[in-house]
Amino acid sequence: MKLEFVGPASLLETGDVFYPAVLDGKDLKCSFSYEALQDLDPEGVETNVLQLFKTHQLKLLSIVEQKILNGHAVDGAVHLFSHDLVLD
């Protein structure tokens, strides 16, 4: 399995963040829920969702990679929600 995160991150109309990837030569849509991103900043210090994503990008992409390896990529997409986060 070959996975490449190609980016860049963009904001969807729903407030979620989209980050494109390529899995075994096919486009893969990675989305990160607005709620999950908010959970990373419980104090509400960062109000820019894209900046919040960029601040936690490595952790978020690592979690999505694990979801993909566990077979959770369906129909060319994988979604990260609050319950997927393992907060320190």
Predicted regions and their residues:
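Short linear sequence elements within intrinsically disordered, low-complexity coil regions
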Residues: P8-S10, L23-D24, L37-D39, L58, ...
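N-terminal start-of-chain detector that recognizes signal peptides
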Residues: M1-F5, S33, L50-F53
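A short, structured beta-strand/loop element
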Residues: F18-D41
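Solvent-exposed, flexible loop/coil residues
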Residues: F5-A9, F32, D41-G44, S82-D84
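Generic detection of intrinsically disordered/low-complexity segments and helix-coil linkers/edges
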Residues: L12-E13, K26-L28, T47, D75
